[in-house]
């Protein structure tokens, strides 16, 4: 997906859509910015047109040249065989516009679910193939806005929320609870989950 791609975020949505139709995809890492190679099914081409995603039909010679270029360069091919079940780690009171990941997945039309500390504590990470985090603070220090917003109502509400969750999960402090969540995420990745 180089500069010739009209809408690279929507292209990820096309890849996801294609996987929902039990059609495999080759993700061409570092080739023209990470293009997707998909068999020329009419339903894929139609969906690309609907969503405004640029696609280029290729012939066998083009395919051989692409594979050769990938083989000779700092590139690779990842075979995508099934649609991933995606989770975003985010507090339940976050708004969709509070983070770029949620905005991007909504725009790309990629399905996801949200989870937070309760679900991670209960072992729900294993239900997902892919977990998205964004700049989370697992130190138990209530985030980066203490200095500028520690007296703001929203900040105090967030602090109470964190403390309540930690207590309800049986931890003596937010610090201990967040450390346990970080370990659960580490184990999730160690067991093959994508982060």
Task: List each model region and its residues.
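Generic recognition of flexible, low-complexity loop/linker segments
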Residues: 75, 118-121, 183-185
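Extracytoplasmic/secreted cell-surface and envelope-processing proteins
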Residues: 7-10, 96-98, 123-124, 139-148
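A structural signal for short, well-ordered beta-strand segments and their strand-loop junctions
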Residues: 26-28, 113-116, 132-133
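Short loop/helix-cap segments at secondary-structure boundaries that form the rim of catalytic
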Residues: 46-49, 122-127
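Extracellular/periplasmic catalytic domains that process cell-envelope and extracellular macromolecules
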Residues: 79-82, 123-126, 188-190
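Hydrophobic targeting/anchoring helices
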Residues: 1-103, 108-110
């Amino acid at each position: 997906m180089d500069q010739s791609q009209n809408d690279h975020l929507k292209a990820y949505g096309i890849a996801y859509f294609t996987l929902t139709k039990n059609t495999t995809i080759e993700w061409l890492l570092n080739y023209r910015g990470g293009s997707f190679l998909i068999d020329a099914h009419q339903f894929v081409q139609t969906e690309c047109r609907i969503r405004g995603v640029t696609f280029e039909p290729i012939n066998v010679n083009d395919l051989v040249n692409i594979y050769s270029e990938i083989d000779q360069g700092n590139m690779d091919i990842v075979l995508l065989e099934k649609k991933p079940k995606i989770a975003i780690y985010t507090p339940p009171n976050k708004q969709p516009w509070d983070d770029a990941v949620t905005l991007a997945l909504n725009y790309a039309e990629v399905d996801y679910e949200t989870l937070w500390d309760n679900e991670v504590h209960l072992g729900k990470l294993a239900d997902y193939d892919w977990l998205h985090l964004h700049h989370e603070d697992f130190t138990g220090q209530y985030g980066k806005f203490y200095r500028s917003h520690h007296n703001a109502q929203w900040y105090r509400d967030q602090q109470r929320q964190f403390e309540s969750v930690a207590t309800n999960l049986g931890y003596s402090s937010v610090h201990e609870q967040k450390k346990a969540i970080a370990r659960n995420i580490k184990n999730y990745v160690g067991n093959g989950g994508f982060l």
